[in-house]
């Protein structure tokens, strides 16, 4: 009887929390490569009519990932969501996390994530609706080992750049770069570089700073260029058009990898600022030169 009462009170607390607090999960995309960053947004709306105190405990917001086919997903650690805050009634709070480092989702397939919100003041918890996503396999296009110096005279660490393409939404090809150890046993980062066409002749060169320079075709006459750091972050992205000549990678006389040919598109920050009419200087009447009558 006592167990039944405890279960009943817990169930009542769950329904109370669910009715007065909304929680929604969202992803920027639904398809990811193994080891790619999976940025999840958790939207919490307070409809209880009173202030909520959230985030004070380490386990106030927890996550669970499962494979739809029953494959066991190993949880490496709890996803950290830090920072206490007060959520007033009718207010919305958004917390953003990356699921990738904390769950082993290396097998291609369909997965879903569920978030659980623990409300300490109510001794209650509520679970979100599952958010589904897919982990897809990429096709390897190119790979190369490179060395990373650690600032000492020791032998450099050997890592590997790998370019992969994946059919995003089965409609659009996307180009990815993976940074791993030489054996590809440890993947440090997978980054999406952007869309590409099926007939793209992708060029890749590692420069003297161990950065990867990539040039690929993204449209009928458009090309994208990216520089990737040894840690997998993108240092620079430029866009070129096939006007008069096709862009290609080359090494100049200084030993730097550069883009030769094509027409580079200026970035918005490089364009001159056009002021609105109300900020333009006022028009002034032109000063006419004085004419002296020499016949007088």
Positions of PLM-derived features:
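N-terminal signal peptide c-region/cleavage motif recognized by signal peptidases
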Residues: 14-16
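Low-complexity, Pro/Ser/Thr- and charge-rich linker/hinge segments at domain boundaries
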Residues: 130-158, 238
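Surface-exposed loop/turn elements that mediate protein-protein interactions on large endomembrane-trafficking
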Residues: 174-195, 222-241, 267-293
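Terminal connector regions
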Residues: 102-137
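Short beta-strand elements that form the blades of beta-propeller/WD-repeat-like
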Residues: 150-179, 203-219, 225, 247-272
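Contiguous segments within soluble domain cores/interaction surfaces
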Residues: 20-25, 31-33, 37-100, 110-116, ...
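Positively charged n-region of N-terminal signal peptides that target proteins for export
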Residues: 1-4
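Repeated scaffold domains used in trafficking and secretory/extracellular systems
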Residues: 143-151, 195-205, 239-254, 285-291
